[in-house]
Amino acid sequence: MASTLPIPDINVIAPSFIQRDSQNSDNMKPPPTDFNHPYTPYPIQTAFMQTLYSVLDRTVAVSPPTTTNSTNNTAPSATFSSTAATLIPSNPSTSPSTPPLINPTTAPTVHLADRATEPSLSVTPRTTTSKDKDKGPSSSSSVPKGHAQIALFESPTGTGKSLSLICGSLTWLRNHKRLQFDSEIEKIQQQMEASGEPEWMVESAIKRKREELAQKYEEMERTLERIRQKEREMEKEGEEGQARGGKRRKLDRGKGDEEKGGKKKESGGSRGLTASDEDKEFLIGDWRDEGGLDENDPMGQLSKETRELLEKVGMGTAGGKKEANEGPVAEEEIKIFYTSRTHSQLTQFIQELRRPEFPASVPTPNPQEKPAKEIVKQIPLSSRQKLCINPTVNKLGTLAAINERCQSLQQPKTPKDQRCPYLPNAANLKATHEFRDTALATLPDIEDLYQTGKQLQICPYYASRAAIPGAEVITLPYPLLLQKSAREALGIRLEGNIVIIDEAHNIMDAVSNVHAAEIKYTDLKRAKLSLGMYYQRFHQKLTGENKVMVAQLQRVVEALGVYLKTKLDKAALGLKADQEGIVLDTSLLLKTGGADQINLYKLIRYVQESKLAFKIEGYISYCEEEGRDTDDEEAETEIKARQGRPPVLHTLCSFLTALTNLSSEGRIFYEKIPPPRGELQDMKLSYMLLSPTHAFSSIAESARAVILAGGTMSPFEDYKAHLFPDVPPEKITTLSCGHVIPPDNLCVWTLGSIAPNPKVDTGIGEDCFDFTFAKRSNPNMINRLGLVLLNLCSVVPDGVVAFFPSYGYLEEVIGVWKTHEQAMGPKTIWERLESKKALFIDSKTESSEQTLQKYSDVIHSEVRPLSPAGSRVKGAMLLSVIGGKMSEGINFSDRLGRCVVVVGMPYPNPHSPEWLARREYLEANFIKRYTASQQTSTATAPLPAPVIPPPSNTTHYSTNPSSSRNKDKHKPANVRKLAARDSHQFYENATLRAVNQSIGRAIRHQNDYAAIVLIDNRFEKEHVRAKLPGWIREGWDETQRQAKEDGKALKGLQGMMGRVNMFFRGKN
C-alpha cells in the first residue's frame, strides 16, 4: 500500500492527493509546500500550484474524493499497480465525468496522470527538396501521437490564477535546475570514489566542479545586476520618465520616430524615380537566383552576411549555430512559453511576474549563507508590426506589408546602403549584446522592448532572439505560438519545453482563426487591375519565366472572380441557395481559363520568393503618390480607391495558401455580404478549419507539458476530444477551482418561467421563457422579459449588465420594448426601464470604451442622473451581447456589476453552411473513431466525450459500449444517432463556454458580491447546469438551500425576487 503525503493544512483540512510507491519512494517526490508566493496563498491556490508542479514533475498521483460538496475530508484509499504503472481508486465506478472542483471550504479534487514514464522527445526532420515544395504537403491525415503531459485548469478571475501559474511553474523550473546542478556534482563524486582516489582529492574535484558550474551563472547575474542598477539610477534621475510600476509609456510611432531616428539614414525612400530606378525598385528579378527563399529556412530572405551574424549572436533558427555565441547567456535550458490572447493580457502577466522572488538556480557555495535570489529572465516576442522601429517600414500599417518590406530590405540583391540600418550587423554587435542583456535583466514588456530598441538603434524584432537562449519565460501572443510557420520564423522550439496557454476557453476558435482566410469579389477586381497595371508597365522587361508566372496568377484571379461573379448574379435573382453555401467541388473555383491546371504550390512559392505582391503594391502606391495618369479608367479608379485598404495581393496569397492546404478538416464557403454604404453588393470566399486537432498536434506532440488555463473553462470534454484525441487519458489532468468569495456573496438563480407553475399550451408554457431560435421572437415573451428586468432594476443597486444571444436579437428586443402595448399600461417597457436606471446599449458601430466609460460615470456619480421623463434614477443597466465586445476582457467588478443577467443561449444558426459542415465533419469523425474502436479489442483512441446526453436526474453517465443497456447501439442507425448527439453536445458545450465567459465578468475579487440570473427554461435542466463553472453550480445550490430555509417560493418571478431582494438587503 502506498504511503500518503498530505498537503499542509492552510486554514482548511485538505486531503492528500499525491502518493508515492513505497518501494520506489526515492524517485517519487511530492510537490513542495513553499512556492515563493508574494503573499500567503489561498488553499485553492496551494492546490493549484501543487497540481501544476506535479504535472511538470510527472509525479504519480491518484484521484481524490469524487464529490465536491462532501463534508468528509478524508482521502479515499488507493492501490498502486507497479505492473501497469497506474493508480486505481478504491471505488472507480464513482469517478465523475465532470471536472473536479476545489473551493476554500471543501476538499480539493484533482485528477492527476501517471508520471512514471518519461517519453522520448526525439524528432527526425524530413529533408524537403524543391520538388517537394512544388508538390505541396503530404496528404497523410494521421495525427502524431502526443508526448506531452496535459493539464486543464479552471480558476475564476480573482482567485490568483496568474500568480499560481507563475509560482507553480517557476518553482518547479528552479528546483529542476538545482537538481541538474546537484546531479553533475554527484556524478563527479561517484566517478572519483569509484576510482579509489583519496577523500581530499574527491573533495577538491567536487569543489572545482561546483565553482566551474557556478561561474557562468555568477557572471551572468553580475552582468544583469549592473544593468538593473543602471536602470534604477536612470529612473531616479528621471531619464526614463516614471518608475516601472507607474503609468505605462505611450509610444509615438509617427513623425516622432523619424525625428528620433534621424541620425541614421532611413532606407526605403523611392520617390521621384527615373525609369531606370523604377526598374530596380519594382521589376522582378530571377526568382531562382541564390537569393531565393527556402521555405524551411525562416531566415532565407536575409543576405549571407546578415544570416551569419544573426547566427553568431544566437538569433538564428532553432537549428542554427550557437556555439559561437558570445557572452554568458547562450546555453538553452527548459523554458516556459506563456501565451495569451491579447498584448494587454501579456502585459498584465509580466506585471504579475515582477512580484514574486525565486531562489537562485545554483545553490550558494556556503550552506550557512542565506539562499540567493535570482530575477526571472523573461523575453516577450511579437510581430514586426509591434516591434519595427524603422519609420519607413512600420508606417505601412498592415502586418503583411510590413513583413514584405522588411524582408525586401534584407534580400541579398538589395544594395547595402538601402538595407535597413537597424538590423544587427558587425558595426552594432555591441548594441545587440546590450539589448539582449537589458531585456534579460529588466522583465520588459513589448513597449519596453520597443523603447530599448529605439534607444540602442537596434531592431527589437531580430535582437530579441538573442535573448531566447538565456530566457526562462518567453511570452508571446496566440498567433506566434499556434502557427507552426510563425514558430519556425522566430526560431522557437517546443521540444521538451513547457507551454502555458492562458485564457484558453477560446483556444479551439483561436486555432481555427489563425488558419482561416477569405477573399471578396471586390478584392479580386482590385487584384486584376493591379496585375494589369504592373504587367502593362513592365511586361517587356520581364524574363520569360516571370511572364509565365505573372500570367498564371492573372488566370487564377480571373477564374476566382468569374466564380464569385456568377454566384453574385444568381444571388441577385433571390435564389436562396446562391446566397451562401459550401463549395463542394473546389476544382470549380479554377475552372475558367484552364486555371485548374496550374500548379498552385509552385505559384504561391513564386509569389512569396519573388516578392511579387510587395513589388506590385509598391508600384501602385508609387503611381498614387506621383499622381501618374494611366490609359485605363478602371486603373485610375483603383489607385484612388485603394487608400486605407489592406494590400489586396497579400489577401489573395493568404487565400491561395489556404486553398492548397485543404484537408478533411477544412472547407471553402461562399457568402453574399452586405456592402458598405454607397457600394455595390459583394460576395466572398472563405476557408474555415472545421477541427483544430491536426493543427494543434505539432504542439501536443513535442512539448514536455501543455497547460490550458482559464477562468471559465467548463465544460472540459471538448478540449480532450478535439485538441488531444490521441493522448492517453492517464496523461491528462483536470482541475477546477472554486471561488475565494464567501458563499453569501453570490446569488445564482435560473428563471424558466415567470410563474411558479406555468400553464401549458400548444408546445410551450404561456409563462415560460423559451429563447430558442424558432420561438424567441414572441412579443409577449419579450415583454415578460422586460418585466423581469424592471423588477430586478427596482432592487439591485448600482449596475446591472444583461447579455443577449446576438446583436440582431438585442435590437429586436429593444424594438418590442419601445412599442406601446395596451396590456402593459400607459408607458412602454423601455420608458419604465428608463425611469429605474440609465440605459446603455453595446452597439456594433459604437466604441465599447466610450459606452463603458459613460456607464461607469453614471454609476460612480455622486449625483443621481435624470431619466428622460425627469425623474432621478439609481444606477445604470448595460445591454450587451454574449460573445460581443463587452463579454470578454472587460471587468464589471464591484458597483459596475451587482447583477449579471443572461438571456437565452447563443446557439449558432443551425441552418448556416458553416454549422452544417462542422456538424457533418464531427459526425463523420465520430463514426470513424467509434467503428475503429469496435474493430479492435482495445480502442486505438479515446472516444470524444460526452457521447449521450445524461438523464435529467444525474450529471454523471457512462459511455461504455459494452454496457448491457446499450447492446443495440452498435447498429449503424444507432451509431449515427450517437454521432448526431455528439455533434449537438459540441455546440452545446461551445454555447455554454460563451455563457460562462459572460457570467465571469462579475465577481472579480474576494470581497466582491453579485447576483447572477440565467433566464431560459433550458438553464433549469440539470445537464445544462452541470456545464456551468463549479462555483456557479455551488452558488445555485446555496441559493436554493437558503430559499427553502426562508420558506419562499422556489420558482418563478416571485421566488427570484424574494431571494434577490433578501440577498441585497444583507449587503446594505
UniProtKB/Swiss-Prot annotation:
Binding residues for ATP: S155, P156, T157, G158, T159, G160, K161, S162
Cofactor note: Binds 1 [4Fe-4S] cluster.
Alphabetized Gene3D superfamilies for the sequence: P-loop containing nucleotide triphosphate hydrolases
Family (UniProt): Belongs to the DEAD box helicase family. DEAH subfamily. DDX11/CHL1 sub-subfamily.
Keywords from the UniProt entry: ATP-binding, Cell cycle, DNA-binding, Helicase, Hydrolase, Iron, Iron-sulfur, Isomerase, Metal-binding, Nucleotide-binding, Nucleus
Encoding gene, per UniProt annotation: chl1
InterPro entries cross-referenced by the UniProt entry: ATP-dep_Helicase_C, DinG/Rad3-like, Helic_SF1/SF2_ATP-bd_DinG/Rad3, Helicase-like_DEXD_c2, P-loop_NTPase, RAD3-like_helicase_DEAD, Rad3/Chl1-like
Ranges annotated as biased composition (Basic and acidic residues): 228-242, 253-268
Regions of compositional bias (Polar residues) in chain numbering: 119-128, 953-964
Protein name as annotated: ATP-dependent DNA helicase chl1
Region Disordered, residue ranges: 85-147, 228-282, 933-974
Known cofactor(s): [4Fe-4S] cluster
Motif DEAH box mapped to chain: 502-505
Span of domain Helicase ATP-binding: 31-556
Keyword Cell cycle attached: yes
High-level lineage: Eukaryota, Fungi, Dikarya, Ascomycota, Pezizomycotina
Top EC class of this enzyme: isomerase
Biological processes annotated in GO: establishment of sister chromatid cohesion; nucleobase-containing compound metabolic process
CC per GO annotation: nucleus
CDD domains (alphabetical): SF2_C_XPD
GO molecular function terms attached to this record: ATP binding; ATP hydrolysis activity; DNA binding; DNA helicase activity; iron-sulfur cluster binding; metal ion binding
Coarse class of the protein's main subcellular location: nucleus
Feature: compositional bias, Pro residues: 943-952
Stated role: ATP-dependent DNA helicase important for chromosome transmission and normal cell cycle progression in G(2)/M. May have a role in changing DNA topology to allow the loading of proteins involved in maintaining sister chromatid cohesion in the vicinity of the centromeres. Has a specific role in chromosome segregation during meiosis II.
